[in-house]
Swiss-Prot record:
Full protein name: Allophycocyanin subunit alpha-B
PTM (free text): Contains one covalently linked bilin chromophore.
Null mutant phenotype: Increased levels of phycobilisomes (PBS) and photosystem I (PSI), decreased levels of photosystem II (PSII) per cell. Cells are unable to undergo state transitions. When combined with an ApcF deletion mutant the cells have decreased PBS, PSI and PSII, and require glucose to grow.
Pfam families linked: Phycobilisome
Organism field: Synechocystis sp. (strain ATCC 27184 / PCC 6803 / Kazusa)
Family that this chain belongs to: Belongs to the phycobiliprotein family.
GO annotation, biological process: photosynthesis
Binding residues annotated for (2R,3E)-phycocyanobilin, in chain numbering: 81
SUPFAM superfamilies cross-referenced by the UniProt entry: Globin-like
């Protein structure tokens, strides 16, 4: 939920107008809109490149994942890993656009550790996967945009750790 929606819902729940501080928060959110859109466009337009670079780094670090018996062994499992990379990149993009981490949590993180555990996917490997995805994505952004984006990746990494 965006900052604007949060302020409106909170004020409405309390039967009041938004406070001056809340309105300043909305103003700050709106002034960063162009940056958030620029980041989202860069991530979306470069998804394939980011995912490709990240998977190369992960499987270089953990070649056992692609070996027989590994979680990314075989084309089907490998494609599922790449699909998950794209999914996590989209989650970060949703957070950046909303200006907060709520879309990441509500759209994608509830139950994710349990799901991976039930599928015998090593959660530390997924943490490594999101870490290399972060590195690949931030490498395409300016320093300012990378600083804005990094906390969304960090939130996922911390949640899964």
């Amino acid at each position: 939920m965006s900052v604007v929606s949060q302020v409106i819902l909170q004020a409405d729940d309390q039967l009041r107008y938004p406070t001056s501080g809340e309105l300043k928060g909305i103003q700050a959110f709106l002034t960063t809109g162009a940056q958030r859109i620029r980041i989202a466009e860069t991530l979306a337009e470069n998804e394939k490149k980011i995912v490709d670079q990240a998977q190369k780094q992960l499987f270089k670090k953990h070649p056992e994942y692609r070996a027989p018996g590994g979680n990314a062994y075989g084309q089907r499992q490998y494609n599922q890993c790449l699909r998950d990379y794209g999914w996590y990149l989209r989650l970060v993009t949703y957070g950046v656009l909303a200006g907060n981490k709520e879309p990441i949590e509500t759209t994608g993180l509830i139950g994710v550790k349990e799901m991976y555990n039930s599928l015998n996917v090593p959660v530390p490997g997924m943490v490594d996967a999101v870490t290399v995805l972060k590195d690949a994505a931030l490498g395409l952004l300016s320093a300012e945009d990378a600083n804005e984006t990094a906390p969304y990746f960090d939130y996922i990494i911390q949640f899964m750790s």
